């Protein structure tokens, strides 16, 4: 076959052949013609440009009629030539005898024989594309578009916020359906058919207060969210208003580790049979985790709604408060789930006040005789309002759970607590001291991995001790305390040095000077002093804390003590008012 492609040559002629072969009108049946593509300038040789190229055989398959388009231009020549080919080749000429054949006998003669350079692929693309076919680059297209007006941007942001709100409502419907599978499925079936003897009395642990959560969302909260579709401004008030009601999620999460343990015992037998009987796709454990996931999801959706609502130029003050609420409640839920995995503590954790913080420290604990151990141990430390608990993390989950568990090791009551900060100038180290009923001192040295963690704990512990100190001072001298508070408020400045400042709490040399003089050193006297001696026991503390305070006039009316509560503790107390 003529013009066959030889190995090692450029593939450009083959590309041209494939493109031209798709247009059957360009060739007469049985005709053969040789085309030669020019070099880098993009022009076409005379054999192709004229439309009546020199024939490859003794007679031409095409006649040089007046319909020939003539030599095309350097860029769009090939396209113009293709556009006129159908008209030019409409009259089929006589083919040489024995030369006629199907389209597969066509062959384009490469220009390699003439020594001409073949064009690059980019040039071929330019030839095949007409000047009107070129697509504008994205950058130029973006620049050419007129920037959106501020009103259009706000409109789009508002539309996106409504999309987030719609997603919130739709996912709420799905959430209620999932809770219904538990309450109207598992719980109703177990109540009707009874439970195995080994599970009797423990079925309430499995479900906790999930029925209460389900009924509230089904009968009230879902309808309120649907109302927000017509009145989006109501969304923020909805979450702020029901902050206390959302405390039921904290109760549920506190019970969740116990529920996981019971379900793990019966999940492969009894609960699996119930699932097949009810025809549910999800297992019971997958449904029981839905409330935990949902309380986290509210936070994410509210943040997205706040972002777009703010871009739309709407008032977002209430929304920011709602986001703050829904960031706080999930944190409390997570804390309660962690506490549910604490084992070995004799007493009720719920009676120790709110969990204010938890972190992992390298702790040097006291041994027999009050001396510090020669080596430290890794401990998970929990800070409550009334107690500090030291625990050891277990390698695996507790009683079949997937999350890490903790075993109680030691504790310090806040009423016996003292604080020493920045030991030996190290911002990562501080000490907590505990005074026993017989006056003995136990000292725990804590070292954090990050100075920020250590300083945060020093601040939180100091704040607790300061609040307790103020409360005791108010009990001992309510008139003087009230007068001091009135003077502070009238001057419009904070009441004394801030938490962790040298004026209130000596975290430097004074704290290191006497390891047996904790900041709250006089508090244990409340446990030992008989009635009537409390005031005398607290007198040194009162003088140290309050200094020289002017005496109140004798005719001053008695004022009841009003110890202040930090805002964060006030919010915690608000959540703890259980109206469920």
From Swiss-Prot:
It is found in: Cell membrane; Cytoplasm, Myofibril, Sarcomere. Residues 348-466 form the PH domain. It comes from the Eukaryota. Gene3D superfamilies: Dbl homology (DH) domain, Pleckstrin-homology domain (PH domain)/Phosphotyrosine-binding domain (PTB). Residues 278-299 are annotated as: Important for binding to Rho GTPases. Keywords: Cell membrane, Cytoplasm, Guanine-nucleotide releasing factor, Membrane. Its main location: membrane. Isoform 1 and isoform 2 are highly expressed in excitable tissues, such as brain, heart and muscle. Also detected in kidney and liver. GO terms for cellular component: cytoplasm; cytosol; extrinsic component of membrane; myofibril; plasma membrane; sarcomere. Residues 48-76, 128-157, 482-524, 545-580 are annotated as: Disordered. InterPro entries: DBL_dom_sf (IPR035899), DH_dom (IPR000219), PH-like_dom_sf (IPR011993), PH_domain (IPR001849), RhoGEF_Guanine_NuclExch_SF (IPR051336), SOS1_NGEF_PH (IPR055251). Residues 160-336 form the DH domain. Residues 467-493 are annotated as: Sufficient to bind activated GNAQ. Changing residue 475 to A: Reduces exchange activity mediated by GNAQ activation; in truncated construct. GO terms for molecular function: guanyl-nucleotide exchange factor activity. Residues 555-566 have a biased composition (Pro residues). Residues 509-520 have a biased composition (Polar residues). Residues 48-67 have a biased composition (Low complexity). GO terms for biological process: axon guidance; regulation of small GTPase mediated signal transduction. Changing residue 471 to A: Reduces exchange activity mediated by GNAQ activation; in truncated construct. The guanine nucleotide exchange activity is autoinhibited by the PH domain. Interacts (via the DH domain) with POPDC1 (via the C-terminus cytoplasmic tail). Interacts with activated GNAQ and GNA11. Interacts with RHOA, CDC42 and RAC1. May play a role in actin cytoskeleton reorganization in different tissues since its activation induces formation of actin stress fibers. It works as a guanine nucleotide exchange factor for Rho family of small GTPases. Links specifically G alpha q/11-coupled receptors to RHOA activation. May be an important regulator of processes involved in axon and dendrite formation. In neurons seems to be an exchange factor primarily for RAC1. Involved in skeletal myogenesis. PANTHER family: PLECKSTRIN HOMOLOGY DOMAIN-CONTAINING FAMILY G MEMBER 4B-RELATED, RHO GUANINE EXCHANGE FACTOR-RELATED. This is Rho guanine nucleotide exchange factor 25. It comes from Homo sapiens (Human).
């Amino acid at each position: 076959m003529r013009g066959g492609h030889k190995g090692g040559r450029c593939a450009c002629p083959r590309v041209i052949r494939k493109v031209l072969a798709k247009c059957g009108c360009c060739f007469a049946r049985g005709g053969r013609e040789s085309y030669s593509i020019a070099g880098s300038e993009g022009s076409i040789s005379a054999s192709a440009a004229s439309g009546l190229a020199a024939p490859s055989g003794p007679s031409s398959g095409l006649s040089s009629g007046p319909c020939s388009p003539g030599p095309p231009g350097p860029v769009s020549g090939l396209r113009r030539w293709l556009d006129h080919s159908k008209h030019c080749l409409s009259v089929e000429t006589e083919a040489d005898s024995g030369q006629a054949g199907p389209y597969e006998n066509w062959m384009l003669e490469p220009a390699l024989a003439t020594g001409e350079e073949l064009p690059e692929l980019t040039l071929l693309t330019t030839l095949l594309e007409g000047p009107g076919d070129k697509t504008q680059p994205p950058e130029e297209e973006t620049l050419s578009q007129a920037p959106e007006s501020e009103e259009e941007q706000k409109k789009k942001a508002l539309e996106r916020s409504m999309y987030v709100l719609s997603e919130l409502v739709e996912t709420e419907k799905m959430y209620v359906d999932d809770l219904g599978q538990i309450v109207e499925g598992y719980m109703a079936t177990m109540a009707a058919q009874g439970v195995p003897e080994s599970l009797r009395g423990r079925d309430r642990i499995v479900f906790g207060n999930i029925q209460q959560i389900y009924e509230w969302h089904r009968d009230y909260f879902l309808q309120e969210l649907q109302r927000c579709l017509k009145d989006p401004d109501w969304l923020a008030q909805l979450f702020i208003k029901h902050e206390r009601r959302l405390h039921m999620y904290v109760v549920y999460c506190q019970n969740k580790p116990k529920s996981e343990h019971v379900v793990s015992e019966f999940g492969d037998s009894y609960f699996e049979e119930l699932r097949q009987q009810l025809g549910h796709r999800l297992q019971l454990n997958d449904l029981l985790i839905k409330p935990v996931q949902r309380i986290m999801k509210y936070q994410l959706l509210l943040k997205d709604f706040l972002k777009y609502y703010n871009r739309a130029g709407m008032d977002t003050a209430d929304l920011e408060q709602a986001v703050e609420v829904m960031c706080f409640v999930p944190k409390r839920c997570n804390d309660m789930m962690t506490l549910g995995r604490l084992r070995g503590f004799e007493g009720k954790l719920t009676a120790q006040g709110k969990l204010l913080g938890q972190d992992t420290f390298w702790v040097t604990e006291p041994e027999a005789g009050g001396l510090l151990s020669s080596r430290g141990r890794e401990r998970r430390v929990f800070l409550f309002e009334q107690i500090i608990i030291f625990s050891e993390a277990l390698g695996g989950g507790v009683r079949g759970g997937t999350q890490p568990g903790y075993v109680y090791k030691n504790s310090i009551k806040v009423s016996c607590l003292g604080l020493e900060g920045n030991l030996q100038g190290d911002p990562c180290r501080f000490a907590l001291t505990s005074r026993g009923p017989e006056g003995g001192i136990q000292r725990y040295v804590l070292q954090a991995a990050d100075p920020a963690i250590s300083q945060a704990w020093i601040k939180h512990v100091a704040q607790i001790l300061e609040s307790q100190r103020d409360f005791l001072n108010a009990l001992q001298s309510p008139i003087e305390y009230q007068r001091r508070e009135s003077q502070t408020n009238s001057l419009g400045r904070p009441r004394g040095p801030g938490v962790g400042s040298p004026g209130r709490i000596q975290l430097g040399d004074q704290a290191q000077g006497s390891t047996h003089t904790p900041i709250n050193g006089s508090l244990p006297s409340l446990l030992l002093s008989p009635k009537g001696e409390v005031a005398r026991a607290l007198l040194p503390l009162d003088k140290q804390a309050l200094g020289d305070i002017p005496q109140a006039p004798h005719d001053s009316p008695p004022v009841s003590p009003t110890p202040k509560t930090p805002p964060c503790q006030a919010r915690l107390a608000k959540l703890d008012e259980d109206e469920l």
